């Protein structure tokens, strides 16, 4: 493949990704049939805080507009969480994972079935909740429920398909980019609201400046932590083949501090959001539920405790299923590599695992700090929820990963062209 064709392929992938994200954004403005928009606005104006506010941000504002993508990609993420957990404890799923490409295809299919089931359940709960709100549904009844469930399930599955298309034919991880696009689309409204709070005197100008300084520092901190590596020195012995000596070189095994990326924050959020997707509507007039839901708002100890626990758990869990120290040690021994001062095999695996555990601990604390520190500000000042730490983390990490993929493809294209020039030069 020539440099020009490689560049054209990259350009086409980027344009394809932008097109798919534009289709997604269009879908967030297509309303569910049978909803009174005026009554919906009145209801949503009083339900923009807490977990429902976070869910609305992740869905790109589709919840506040009660669009066909109102559930966003969360049913798929929730299904993925369940399947990933089963992979760690179930022999059946462990065997599927060990079967390679065939097993992964089967796991993907099971995840899709789980997505349909969750979207159906949540769609039905949503339809019941909408009907319980006075004058919100124009013609309540079985017809509305069937239409809503069908539309919600179709919208969720279409959104999942869009994400898969981005991953296969575009740039970056499709599911992450859809969440990224939803958050970015809500940022302008958050900025306008923040400046309006300053203009009216609800928040001092000094506090707004402090907020933006903290925002910049948080972004820089995230970039630093995502780029940070712990390099393990790997040596290769010299080997004589004929009259020549080969090998004797050194390399490094790079381990990221945050091996799990943004997945723990997304999974922890999805776990908290799972019961909220319809309960805010279904029990909106229930006093017990209202008292219980008050504990799941910004700054509340129970909310932050559950969120922090979820982030820490999924950081360790996801790292354990994506990086296997024993497998890495076996591959090193197979190719003659060794860590200086450490015996090949089991000792090397234990050494790598020990380092990985320390790095994962730091990574879990870093993710928890970034996601929860802004919650203290949100709890004490009238700052829009869209500027929460989780939103910032997802935007920055997904942007870094996407730019890295683009750079990798460009470098690969340049390297291929250099090799061809070298061959022609000979």
What do these predicted ranges mean?
Residues 1-97, 102-426:
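N-terminal cationic and glycine-rich segments that engage phosphates or anionic surfaces
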